[in-house]
Amino acid sequence: MGDQVQFARMNGLGNKILVVDMRGRKDRVTPQAAIALNADPATEFDQIMAIHDPKSAGTDAWIDIVNSDGSMAQACGNGTRCVVQALAAETGRKAFLFHTVAGLLEAKEHDNGTISVDMGKPRFGWDQIPLAEEFHDTRRIELQIGPIDAPVLHSPSVASMGNPHAIFWVENDVWSYELDRFGPLLENHPIFPERANISIARIRSRQEMDLRTWERGAGLTLACGSAACAAAVNGARTGRTERMVTVNVPGGPLKIEWRERDDHVIMTGPAEWEWSGTVDPVTGIFARNEPESGDNGARAL
């Protein structure tokens, strides 16, 4: 085996996360390593959260986010909660400030074990999302799947939560749509020059919605935190919901608040530790640690 680092297999409401400790190193998890890890059923994942030494004063870490296809992501709310749980177990602290390519992320662990992440302000400008064409109102853009006179999905609300999202509002059960079929087509639609996360959302009340997501670079997942935030924000700005909602993703509920005083989006939910090991961040070759007697719950990396 080559040069190994510590990593943990975790999940945020079923969103499969590998938290990799790259502190003290100058290199990064390679796309080849990500693809190799995703090809093994033991380490198949949705996102890698690679923890690096901080690049700016006052922050606790720089985090690289890698999708299962080896591409880089700008945001992963569920993965951020997993990082918080691992670092809280390591340090005994409750609050953290991370830096990512999308900006700063504040996060804290609550006494009940849930974790809140400040995902920052949503962006609605067509060139901020970004879109390939100018739209003055991104609450509803011209995009559809299916026949012109009877589209299956149409007129999504779009926004950026550090990464681009399109939310299609539907009347039927979110499970009745072939998202595994439509997702790749919409993710790679020319209107999205950086590709996009594609979600279908059904409103249950002004305080609750159901959501399924095809994640850019990862495919169908049980949970996508940034998509839940994008859906909640778009629900509020289109008049469908209040600014505080429960978003039911396949893995369970997330609490999302679009805070009025500063427009920041706060996501709250759980994280779960599964197992740990060592991995070569260049090749993806890994070894699983033997569990200790009575080993359960969150542990330090």
Swiss-Prot record:
Per its UniProt record, what Pfam families does this chain match? Answer: DAP_epimerase
Q: What class of enzyme is it?
A: isomerase
Its GO CC terms are: cytosol
Tell me which Gene Ontology terms the entry assigns under biological process.
Answer: lysine biosynthetic process via diaminopimelate
Molecular function, one GO term: diaminopimelate epimerase activity
Catalysed conversion reaction: (2S,6S)-2,6-diaminopimelate = meso-2,6-diaminopimelate
The record's InterPro entries line, in alphabetical order, gives: DAP_epimerase_AS (IPR018510), DAP_epimerase_DapF (IPR001653)
The record's subcellular locations are: Cytoplasm
Identify the EC number(s). Answer: 5.1.1.7
Q: Kindly tell me the pathway this chain contributes to.
A: Amino-acid biosynthesis; L-lysine biosynthesis via DAP pathway; DL-2,6-diaminopimelate from LL-2,6-diaminopimelate: step 1/1
- Per its UniProt entry, which superkingdom is the organism in? Bacteria
Its quaternary structure? Homodimer.
Entry function = Catalyzes the stereoinversion of LL-2,6-diaminopimelate (L,L-DAP) to meso-diaminopimelate (meso-DAP), a precursor of L-lysine and an essential component of the bacterial peptidoglycan.
The molecule here is called Diaminopimelate epimerase
Upper classification of the organism: Bacteria, Pseudomonadati, Pseudomonadota, Alphaproteobacteria, Hyphomicrobiales
